[in-house]
């Protein structure tokens, strides 16, 4: 089998017992399968939930806390217990682990985004298994990923993974809830994830986790946009992950095996960078950006909104107000206001910035579903 870079996400329900406590037998089963993958030469990055589930028992809670403070306190206690379990288990296979705790803010800064990539790839080059979790004990609501499903999708994207494997307590995606409808149909393969499927999906699937099927669909949709194929399902035994890579997994395969990765710079522009303003463009510029792969020139700009600086990321909308993409601008809002609608030669007379483009095509990402820009 071809050596692959694989992101494996393990949910809380796949790590805990019926009471919600950390189950070391389940944890070891996952560890054994990851160790087997590494022995075969694959690169593995582990995204793990379970900190809150591991910590609420020692804190004296009878079940998973519902308040933010309770969850964060449980995560503070549970993260150490969770890592202790992983370190002890992986040590039996001679595997060194490295812990990385992230918040949404780590993805906003382009410098931190690149530093994160460098750290993880260095760990992989040294044979270390990166174990990643959201830093639940310090995250505030507006800086969270929502669940580790989305975190796993974002990590698989910027690491240019070959596959994202999301392990859960349900063996794949269904057209209805299989726990309440025994006639629910399981999908063995889905070419893509539609908005209608996401709207029809329910909420959290268990009392010990935050990620139900809806979050997994959203994560799969995001991973596919990065060029990463996805598997959602379950399994047991040391060969379960390799079986999944070979197409023999008990779950749902989503997307083609490989259809090209989105560049890391464009991932940051499209999904992570703060949006500093908005530019409206005419029909000709819209066609040039979406269909001809051209850069945005001053002549195509019809309106400027916000107070952004040069090299900020802005949204680009058409004359109907629909967002068609995002890009990194070479002009500040005030400079662009002076040169909008002008030819490139005329624009040079009014600005000290002699760049002909407002947004170069290398710093542009289309967000229109019918147009894919790599």
Swiss-Prot record:
A GO BP entry is:
L-proline biosynthetic process
- Function (record text): Catalyzes the transfer of a phosphate group to glutamate to form L-glutamate 5-phosphate.
The reaction(s) annotated as catalysed by this protein in its Swiss-Prot or TrEMBL entry are: L-glutamate + ATP = L-glutamyl 5-phosphate + ADP
Residues that hold ATP according to the record:
9, 168-169, 210-216
Q: Give the molecular function GO annotations.
A: ATP binding; glutamate 5-kinase activity; RNA binding
Query: Record's InterPro entries?
Result: AceGlu_kinase-like_sf, Asp/Glu/Uridylate_kinase, G5K_ProB, Glu/AcGlu_kinase, Glu_5kinase, Glu_5kinase/COase_Synthase, Glutamate_5-kinase_CS, PUA
> Per the UniProt record, which EC number(s) apply here?
2.7.2.11
Q: What is the lineage of its organism?
A: Bacteria, Bacillati, Bacillota, Bacilli, Bacillales
**For binding substrate, which residues are annotated in this chain's numbering?**
49, 136, 148
Family matches, as HAMAP family: ProB (MF_00456)
Q: Which PROSITE patterns match?
A: GLUTAMATE_5_KINASE, PUA
| Pfam families for the chain | AA_kinase, PUA
Q: Which Gene3D superfamilies match?
A: Acetylglutamate kinase-like, PUA domain
> Where does the record place it?
Cytoplasm
Chief localization? cytoplasm
The residue ranges of the PUA domain are 276-351
- What pathway does the UniProt record associate with this protein? Amino-acid biosynthesis; L-proline biosynthesis; L-glutamate 5-semialdehyde from L-glutamate: step 1/2
Q: Which UniProt keywords apply?
A: Amino-acid biosynthesis, ATP-binding, Cytoplasm, Kinase, Nucleotide-binding, Proline biosynthesis, Transferase
Does the keyword Transferase feature in the UniProt annotation?
yes
Q: What family, per the record?
A: Belongs to the glutamate 5-kinase family.
Q: Name one GO cellular component term.
A: cytosol
Supply the name of the protein: Glutamate 5-kinase
Species name for this entry? Geobacillus sp. (strain WCH70)
